Amino acid sequence: MKYNIVFKFNVEGIVDKPDVIGAIFGQTENLFGDDFDLRELQDKGRLGRISVDLSTSKGRSEGTIIIPSNLDKVETALVAAMIENVDKVGPYNAEFKLIDIVDIREEKIKKIIGRAKEILGSWSREKTLDIREVINEITSSVKTGELTEYGPERLPAGPDVDKDPELIIVEGRADVINLLRYGYKNVIAVEGATGKIPQTLVDLTKQKKAVIAFLDGDHGGDLILKELLSSNIKLDYVARAPTGKEVEELTGKEIAKSLSNMVTIAQYIKKQQEAQQAIKQALATETTTTAVTTTSTQIQVEVKPEEKKEIQITVPAQIIEEIKKLPGTLEGILLDENWNIIEKIQVRDIVQKLENISADSIRYIVFDGVITQRLVDLASAKNIKMLIGARIGGINRRPKELELLSFNDIIS
């Protein structure tokens, strides 16, 4: 069957289900010839069994009727109109009213879409081989884990942080949610630690065979790693997101690749020292060259501080309430000039949305994610006035006409 035709009916008297069904057959018989007679259509399998749900009260009868249809849309609509034309059940006046025509195939479509998502999830998850087998267990399942809170500090974590011999440390709640989406359940967040790593996390790492710090590929990730290295936490490996990217926005393939490219702490520190030494040598060479070419003439230039345009935008109370609901959802809200909600959208779709809109059509964006340089540049090009995100990443170019705020600026 393709459709369910749903009616409501009222009868000005007490009747039974067979009376209702008989009235439908009797008053529609031969209206459009034998080929479109309801009994004939049932015999041919074009219509299903008529289902009647009936109740009586105060001398009246009312209820609903469902008729399955395997006809096309035009024929199904014609059947519906025929039944609405029924005005008697037995000796009593009656009214039949169409409520809905339900497409039964929608349920099948939903099941197909659900299965397609499962297939895509297992396909997207890249399986990697690693001789250290540090990520062997966390790549064995594609089922999204349940977000939990760990310890008295209520650190966002996956369900396997206690029982798995390996542990992945990330920065924030959104990072944990993204890794859970791709099946990594032994993950825990430091929640933007500022100067002190939670003692719960310190104690947890000492119980683990291997501990991996998996951090953003920006300056914020550098700061978190510096805090981890300066604490007494047990840390064995470092993995970084691609340069300029956040862990929370990585795909399953990018996550697997980043983890497979992790290095030991000793290797990481050595690379950092080599990079710093190269910078020092470059600066020393530049200083020497400058000293040789500089003349005795000195020019003094008065440098005036850059004038910064002040932007004062008041966030309405109803939008602040919406912001309070966003943490952990990975969702965003697009708003117009008057702070009216235009659309609610997944964070991962915001950049693509902005690329396809005209300038001035969106004026404010609130979202549960990191404000990146790419998003700032795109928002500026579209004349957006304000970005409000869960966190502000490393921004090198900040347009004067665009205001950037974090959730903490709004709801702290």
UniProtKB/Swiss-Prot annotation:
This is DNA primase DnaG. Forms a ternary complex with MCM helicase and DNA. Component of the archaeal exosome complex. Residues 165-243 form the Toprim domain. Its EC number is 2.7.7.101. Mg(2+) 1 binds at residues 171, 216. Its cofactor is Mg(2+). CDD domains: TOPRIM_primases. Mg(2+) 2 binds at residues 216, 218. Binds two Mg(2+) per subunit. The keyword Cytoplasm does not apply. Keywords: DNA replication, DNA-directed RNA polymerase, Exosome, Magnesium, Metal-binding, Nucleotidyltransferase, Primosome, Transcription, Transferase. It holds the Pfam family Toprim_4. GO terms for biological process: DNA replication, synthesis of primer. The keyword Transcription applies. GO terms for cellular component: cytoplasm; DNA-directed RNA polymerase complex; exosome (RNase complex); primosome complex. SUPFAM superfamilies: Toprim domain. GO terms for molecular function: DNA-directed RNA polymerase activity; metal ion binding; poly(A) binding. Belongs to the archaeal DnaG primase family. RNA polymerase that catalyzes the synthesis of short RNA molecules used as primers for DNA polymerase during DNA replication. Also part of the exosome, which is a complex involved in RNA degradation. Acts as a poly(A)-binding protein that enhances the interaction between heteromeric, adenine-rich transcripts and the exosome. It is an enzyme of class 2 (transferase). Signal peptide: none annotated.
